[in-house]
């Protein structure tokens, strides 16, 4: 999935957009009779979170990413299971409580992305499978 325009988080945008493109392509194959059923069990989305100036931030912009104290990318399924968690302390080590807060925020952000993905799928294919 190519990211045409972004101010940061291109890897996360590619993961979330890539899932959406895959879902739409597979749904088209099901509708055409090429596939019997949609072979997806769950959705996938990714988001960046971090700490900038001592404050947790969701979906870091480029300027925030450049000065972040902590930078983290999280990839999750729609059911809240982790696919990838990659975090870096850019200057000083950080506490477990910061990790927990960033994971909580990432989960909330990914839930919003999933809702957008499912909205696009539903609008594209009326009555389409919204769960995966």
Where would I find each of the regions flagged by the language model?
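Polyanion-binding surfaces on beta-sheet-dominated domains and ring/shell assemblies
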Residues: 1-132
